Amino acid sequence: MSAPSSAPALIPRRGMMLVLSSPSGAGKTTISRALLAEEDGLEMSVSVTTRAPRPGERDGEHYHFIDVARYMALTKDDGLLEHARVFENYYGTPRAPVEAALARGCDVLFDIDWQGTQQVAEKARTDLVSIFILPPSVGELERRLKGRAQDSDAVVAARMAKAMDEISHYFEYDYIIVNDDLDRSIADVRAILRAERLKRARRIGLAEFVNRMRGAGE
């Protein structure tokens, strides 16, 4: 579990939900991994799913694996910040562990699409910071997808079509990063994260800190 960030340690703050969205191949996963490796006080949101674990997946690390009855109960009780059905399986982000992390000053990283981001925004807009990662061009995105050498031409074409739909929702996000240079894009996301941590509204201990300072100066 990540420790709360210490920027600055004197003033307690509430954590934030940091959402990264992008079309497949734009670099979101690579950027997310770099953030988790480099930033203190940042942890990855772990989704629930009703599908069976795949080889190598561990409960509580990759997903929380639950049955359909438990999933439906969470949905009914508003226990999910966002949820979706993908083919025959259900996925969602449990609210309770995210709320607990925010309350102790930890930031939570989300790897979700624009639809999930909309749902989170409806339930917790003040805690949300959203970033959309764009490729530098359509041609570069297609080159990256083909460079994976793991998908057929038909699958690449389908991913490109989906990417155009996803990109059309760019205006719903707080920040836009064009990932033409990976190192710079990672630095930009880290800069956003650090600036958002300093926002007055998130620094829940600020009034007490200032009052103590004023009292000491009298």
Curated annotation (Swiss-Prot):
It is an enzyme of class 2 (transferase). Transmembrane segments: none annotated. It is found in: Cytoplasm. CDD domains: GMPK. ATP binds at residues 22-29. Keywords: ATP-binding, Cytoplasm, Kinase, Nucleotide-binding, Transferase. Its EC number is 2.7.4.8. Residues 15-194 form the Guanylate kinase-like domain. It catalyses: GMP + ATP = GDP + ADP. GO terms for molecular function: ATP binding; guanylate kinase activity. SUPFAM superfamilies: P-loop containing nucleoside triphosphate hydrolases (SSF52540). GO terms for cellular component: cytosol. Belongs to the guanylate kinase family. HAMAP family: Guanylate_kinase. PANTHER family: GUANYLATE KINASE (PTHR23117:SF13), GUANYLATE KINASE-RELATED (PTHR23117). Essential for recycling GMP and indirectly, cGMP. This is Guanylate kinase. It comes from Rhodospirillum rubrum (strain ATCC 11170 / ATH 1.1.1 / DSM 467 / LMG 4362 / NCIMB 8255 / S1).
